[in-house]
Amino acid sequence: MSQAPKIAMVLAAGLGTRMRPLTNDRPKALVEVAGKALIDHMLDRLVAASVETAVVNVHYFADLVEAHLRAREAKGLAPRIVISDERVQALETGGGIKHALALLGEGPVFVANIDSIWIEHAGAAVDAVAAAWDPERMDVCLMLASTTESLGFHDTGDVFLSADGLVRFKDAGEIAPLVYVGVHICKPEITADGPDGPFSLLPLWKRLAADGRVCGVAPEGLWMHVGDPQAKLAAEARLAEA
């Protein structure tokens, strides 16, 4: 096992359109689930996995996100926060990482969405991704979950996982058993040749997967995608039962 990344990129620049009206006056990152902002749920998971620095991209209500993160640091809470400013233009997942390359350093990093919450059944899920990471074999390692153990993700799945951990993205019309649940490790330089401006990671992942360079791990637990107000209520109900 290689050393777990100490730096994470936290993707917090989205408009949160599907979360309206909760995002009429705040970004999705600051929507609270069970009394805690979504971004804090994710930052605390990353800190538990020994992440020391989080590079957070901001766009929609950027000032509110920055103020929240400064207040968090003022309380002495880890991790150290570095802002990647996308106020001029939101750059999506791939473009956001490319824009932040100078802030992310040389090694692999965690990349995390802020709208994924989970209840772990056996061990720490982020640690499981770190344990599976092997930079000789892979450029990306995805955290995955069974469609039967996830709420609010794609019912027809995203990927198949081979016995040796290789990811294959489903073809049109296929039903896959696993979904991507919002956390991965990657070599951030995979985005360097992407276009200037916004672009998604997904086409890049698919090209790398075709070359056998994308792996995955499916820890045990219940994963919840908090993408709209109804999903927020469902997540809070599940957390209350845990």
From Swiss-Prot:
GO terms for molecular function: metal ion binding; nucleotidyltransferase activity. Its cofactor is Mg(2+). Substrate binds at residues 113, 158. Gene3D superfamilies: Spore Coat Polysaccharide Biosynthesis Protein SpsA, Chain A. Keywords: Carbohydrate metabolism, Cell shape, Cell wall biogenesis/degradation, Magnesium, Metal-binding, Nucleotidyltransferase, Peptidoglycan synthesis, Transferase. GO terms for biological process: cell wall organization; peptidoglycan biosynthetic process; peptidoglycan turnover; regulation of cell shape. It catalyses: N-acetyl-alpha-D-muramate 1-phosphate + UDP + H(+) = UDP-N-acetyl-alpha-D-muramate + phosphate. UTP binds at residues 16-18, 28. It comes from the Bacteria. Monomer. Belongs to the nucleotidyltransferase MurU family. NCBIfam families: MurNAcPUrMurU. Catalyzes the formation of UDP-N-acetylmuramate (UDP-MurNAc), a crucial precursor of the bacterial peptidoglycan cell wall, from UTP and MurNAc-alpha-1P. Is likely involved in peptidoglycan recycling as part of a cell wall recycling pathway that bypasses de novo biosynthesis of the peptidoglycan precursor UDP-MurNAc. Is able to complement the fosfomycin sensitivity phenotype of a P.putida mutant lacking murU. This is N-acetylmuramate alpha-1-phosphate uridylyltransferase. It comes from Caulobacter vibrioides (strain ATCC 19089 / CIP 103742 / CB 15) (Caulobacter crescentus).
